[in-house]
């Protein structure tokens, strides 16, 4: 069933018949008054910490592998494990309690960053990539878990998560530039400091996030359901048993599910036949998600990460006409500008909604074509114009990401929503996987083209 913006907790799209400044002021006031501060902070920190190491690793890609290896190699190691995790985990991860998942994610991500930091330059790049893989598995499992968790805390938790992921990009890229370029710390020291960031997820889950809905739903045990009538009886009984679920805004408004939904989601293990039926139903639901939600998210990620890892390392200008003292500074600064755009657009979901997801996706493809042509033909006269394009790229990418999941929360039935949110998240990792292969080929091709045509700047880059 379709939901209007006002009924879903979102502000209407500017220019829509239902929009007006009075409605905006009233809706904004309502949103601010209804926000459960603890829920918002917890999900913002989830989004921030789950994604910040991923961003730091990509920002450090040039320093990890040097200029002799395509940066797409780091991107592939940073996203392929995450992609595989999100591809298979939605079908079994619901059997693992959220508290256990948090400990697993923190252990994997911290161990990965420590391995990267302590691997000496004399050792093979492959050893560092193992650490990248560990962090990637943690990030993938964390994303689908926290997106699924937003189902129980409503639209504002999704807005907080989206803003946190955008903040991760901004803070991660800025932090790496600040530590290595501005403060002058070594790459090892910078990466070592970041290894302790995942501890914040433990604080967020166990000390900040209200656990009322989760504790209440966990008390409900599963009983086999014989037919539809008995299912309805169980649902009614579940609602009666869940009267003690807190009625704060986190659990009762902004698309929070009913008690029966929580009982079903947190019930104990079903029979074998029910498992088979559930798996078949989930596969069928995944197919129905592809064209309206998965494909536009896939397209935008293919385009933007091909730009970030395959094209931007070759978007170089003479140092005297740029704000940089060395060529290695272009790449991380492009990443920072991109993340600024992502943060702004992912944080705007409560105020601006985009329902036509394919439009920004196709605009992102146009960005890829434009910047690739410049890398070949060198027709953009100033690096500052490229700065604007990269910032616009970030706006488009963040817009598609957060609006895709907002559309799911509005249009997918409540009983399917938790699975749909997690399953759709495979598209961003899938798109990045495709982009990693494209970018490895494109960076080498574009750099060779530039050298052959008298621009050898890409060969002058020295790793930090």
From Swiss-Prot:
GO terms for cellular component: fungal-type vacuole; vacuolar membrane; vacuole. It is a multi-pass membrane protein. Its main location: membrane. It comes from the Eukaryota. It is found in: Vacuole membrane. Involved in vacuolar transport and vacuole pH homeostasis. Also required for cytokinesis. This is Protein btn-1. The gene is cln3.
């Amino acid at each position: 069933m379709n939901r209007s913006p006002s009924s879903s907790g979102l502000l209407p799209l500017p220019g829509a018949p239902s929009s007006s400044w009075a409605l905006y002021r009233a809706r904004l006031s309502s949103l601010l008054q209804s926000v459960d501060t603890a829920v918002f902070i917890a999900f913002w920190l989830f989004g921030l910490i789950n994604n910040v190491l991923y961003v730091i690793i990509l920002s450090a890609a040039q320093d990890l592998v040097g200029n002799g290896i395509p940066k797409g190699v780091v991107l592939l190691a940073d996203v392929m494990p995450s992609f595989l995790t999100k591809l298979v985990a939605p079908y079994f991860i619901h059997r693992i309690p959220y508290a256990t998942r948090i400990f697993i994610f923190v252990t994997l991500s911290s161990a990965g960053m420590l391995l990267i930091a302590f691997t000496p330059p004399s050792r093979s790049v492959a050893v560092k990539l193992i650490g990248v893989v560990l962090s990637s598995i943690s990030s993938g499992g964390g994303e689908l878990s926290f997106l699924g968790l937003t189902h129980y805390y409503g639209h504002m938790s999704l807005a907080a998560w989206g803003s946190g992921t955008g903040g991760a990009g901004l803070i991660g890229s800025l932090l790496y530039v600040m530590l290595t370029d501005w403060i002058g710390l070594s790459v090892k020291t910078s990466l070592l400091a970041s290894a302790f960031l995942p501890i914040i997820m433990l604080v967020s889950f166990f000390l900040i996030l209200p656990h009322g809905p989760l504790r209440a739903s966990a008390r409900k045990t599963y009983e086999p359901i014989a037919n539809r009538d008995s299912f309805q009886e169980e649902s009614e009984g579940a609602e009666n048993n869940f009267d003690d679920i807190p009625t704060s805004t986190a659990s009762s408004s902004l698309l929070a599910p009913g008690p029966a939904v929580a009982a079903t989601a947190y019930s104990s293990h079903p029979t074998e036949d029910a498992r088979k039926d559930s798996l078949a139903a989930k596969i069928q639901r995944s197919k129905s998600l592809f064209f309206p939600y998965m494909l536009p998210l896939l397209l935008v990620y293919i385009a933007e990460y091909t730009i970030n890892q395959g094209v931007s390392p070759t978007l170089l200008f003479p140092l005297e006409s740029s704000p940089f003292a060395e060529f290695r500074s272009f790449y991380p600064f492009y990443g920072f500008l991109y993340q600024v755009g992502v943060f702004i657009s992912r944080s705007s979901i409560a105020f601006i909604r985009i329902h036509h997801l394919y439009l920004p996706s196709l605009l992102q493809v146009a960005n890829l074509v434009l910047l690739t042509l410049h890398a070949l033909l060198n027709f953009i006269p100033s690096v500052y114009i490229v700065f604007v394009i990269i910032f616009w790229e970030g706006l488009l990418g963040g817009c598609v990401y957060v609006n895709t999941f907002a559309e799911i929360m509005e249009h997918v039935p409540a009983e399917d929503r938790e699975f749909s949110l997690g399953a759709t998240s495979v598209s961003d990792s899938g798109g990045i996987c495709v982009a990693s292969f494209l970018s490895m080929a494109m960076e080498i091709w574009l750099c060779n083209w530039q050298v052959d045509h008298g621009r050898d700047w890409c060969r002058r880059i020295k790793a930090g």
